[in-house]
Each structure stands twice: as C-alpha cells, then as structure tokens.
C-alpha cells in the first residue's frame, strides 16, 4: 500500500485496478452464494413460465420431511387433490415433477417419451441393475430396443406363449388345488392369496427359464446347498427391499463424497448374494444341458 501511495498518479491507477478486481470478486462471490442458496432451497428459486405448481417445503431439505414412507404414494395422492395432477417437489438439491393421473402419465410416456428417455436412477438401483444393464431401467437407445425385442419374442411372443401353455395351466391348477385345500382344512380362516401367488409364480418362472422347478442348488461362494426359499430371497425379496433403500446422498449430490457405509453394505451384499446364486443356477443348467436333461426353457 505504501508503494501505491508514494507512486503518485501511478499509485492511484494501480489502486483503482485493485479496487476493480476486489469489487468483481465480491460481486462474483455474491452471485455464487445466491446460486448455491437457491439450489439448496434457502431462498426461493426464480419462477419459470408455465411451471407446474410447487409444494411448499423447507430450506435445504425441500419436501423430504413429508416423504417419510418408502412408498409415499398416499402423500402424492393427497397433494394431487390440492395442486392438481402435475406438480413439483424438492428432494434435497433436486426438483422433481410428479405426474399423478393416468392421462398425464400416458402423455408423458408416449407423446413426450423422448424428453424422459434418460433414466435417473438412485444409487441402489444403479448397483442392482448393473448400471442400467436391465431393459426396464436402461436409457432408450439401441441397447434398450435390442434387449426389449429379445425379451418380447422369447417370453411374450406367440411361439413362446404356445410353448409354455402347459406350464401356465399347471400353475393355475396348483393354485386352485391349494385354495380348495385351505378352505377345506379350515373354512373360517381368511385365505392369504399372496403366499399362494408368490409360490406358484416363482415356480412358473423357474420352469420357464431353467426347465425345472429347482429345489436346491450348491453355491460355491456360500460353500453349501441353499434351499428354494433362500433362492427366492436372494433373487427376489432382497432385490425388492434394496430397491427402495434410501441413500441420503441421492438428495444432496454435492455431498456424494461422504461415505454411507451402512447403505453400501446392505446393497452391495445383496447384489453379491444375487450374483452368486444366479451364477450357481447357470452353472447347474449348463451341466444339465451337457447331460441332455434340458427340454424346453429360455436359458
């Protein structure tokens, strides 16, 4: 500073330049702070023309405190009665548009499909789907169209339907027999339809995919045989439970570097168990193919 003062006019000019840089830094920092505050929800975001109504929330967390359930469809329905079939909510640092009617969802999925062809998955689904390797969760493109065509032809096509007709008839007969037996054993006890459907649908999927109703399989990673119930838990139940696991880092992307060990342990352990069981089932199927025991199946 003494050099600027002693420098006369030159010092005054240098001081002016420094003042300009300081002012620019202050203004830039203020703009950045406003942008971050708006993104975090501390201040209200700028209104966009024709934007859907927004559900009021709290700073930073948005509407997260109102979505305590893992399946918050009832909350969405209540909001639809107030704000209409289209509205926006804030989940942490992100804004989400909620479509809450059949007509609006159909328009979005059909007429506006190109605008939502890229699927934003949670961290749990990213792990469970092997980074969008499953057709239902993959981005719309060549891979999605190719795999969807294969799935449709091999499982839902006319020839596939005819090939597995007897298997479906067997499933229906098994369900009816089970229901009749339950009613006969105790007519006054309510029937739990879900358990019967679960057992028979899983049996159907095993027969169609592997050609037999697998009762057990040896898993190298476990060092033992696992039962059919354990196969179901590893390939179905655990996946459904992990799919709705919430990782708070999904809502605050700027904190994604913070570890969440409990979440990661649950999801990666379930995925590893699923992989081990599927590898064992495929290995067993290859051995059956070599022995000539496989008749009609998808795999």
Swiss-Prot record:
The UniProt similarity line reads:
Belongs to the cytochrome P450 family.
GO BP, sorted A to Z: ent-kaurene oxidation to kaurenoic acid; gibberellin biosynthetic process
Which tissues and organs express this gene's product? Expressed in roots and panicles.
Q: Where is the signal peptide?
A: none
Q: Which UniProt keywords apply?
A: Membrane, Transmembrane, Transmembrane helix
Protein's membrane topology: Single-pass membrane protein
Gene3D superfamilies the record matches: Cytochrome P450
Cellular localization per UniProt: Membrane
Give GO terms: molecular function aspect only. ent-kaurene oxidase activity; heme binding; iron ion binding; oxidoreductase activity, acting on paired donors, with incorporation or reduction of molecular oxygen, NAD(P)H as one donor, and incorporation of one atom of oxygen
**What is the name of this protein?**
Ent-kaurene oxidase-like protein 1
- Main subcellular localisation: membrane
Q: InterPro entries, from UniProt?
A: Cyt_P450, Cyt_P450_E_grp-I, Cyt_P450_sf, KO_chloroplastic
Q: Name one GO cellular component term.
A: chloroplast outer membrane
Q: Which positions, given as ranges, span the membrane?
A: 16-36
């Amino acid at each position: 500073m003494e050099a600027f003062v002693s420098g006369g006019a030159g010092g005054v000019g240098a001081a002016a330049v420094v003042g300009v840089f300081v002012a620019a830094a202050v203004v830039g920092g203020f703009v950045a702070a406003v942008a971050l505050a708006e993104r975090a929800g501390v201040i209200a975001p700028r209104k966009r023309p024709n934007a859907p109504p927004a559900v009021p929330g709290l700073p930073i967390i948005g509407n997260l405190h109102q979505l305590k359930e893992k399946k918050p469809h009832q909350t969405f329905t209540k909001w639809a009665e107030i704000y209409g079939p289209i509205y926006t909510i804030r989940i942490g640092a992100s804004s989400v548009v909620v479509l809450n009617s059949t007509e609006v969802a159909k328009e979005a999925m059909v007429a506006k499909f190109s605008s939502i062809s890229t699927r934003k998955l949670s961290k749990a689904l990213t792990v469970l789907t092997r980074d969008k390797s499953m057709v239902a969760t993959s981005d719309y493109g060549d891979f999605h169209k190719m795999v969807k065509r294969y799935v449709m032809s091999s499982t839902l096509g006319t020839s596939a339907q005819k090939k597995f007709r007897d298997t479906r008839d067997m499933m229906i007969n098994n369900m009816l027999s089970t229901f009749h037996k339950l009613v006969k054993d105790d007519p006054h006890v309510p029937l739990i339809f879900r358990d019967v459907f679960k057992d028979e649908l899983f049996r159907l999927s095993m027969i169609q995919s592997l050609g037999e109703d697998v009762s057990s399989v040896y898993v190298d990673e476990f060092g033992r045989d696992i039962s059919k119930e354990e196969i179901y838990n590893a390939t179905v139940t655990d996946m459904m439970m992990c799919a709705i696991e919430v990782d708070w880092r999904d809502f605050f992307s700027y904190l994604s570097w913070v570890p969440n060990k409990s979440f990661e342990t649950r999801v990666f352990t379930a995925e590893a168990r699923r992989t081990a069981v599927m590898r064992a089932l495929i290995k067993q199927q290859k051995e059956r193919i070599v022995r000539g025991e496989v008749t009609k199946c998808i795999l």
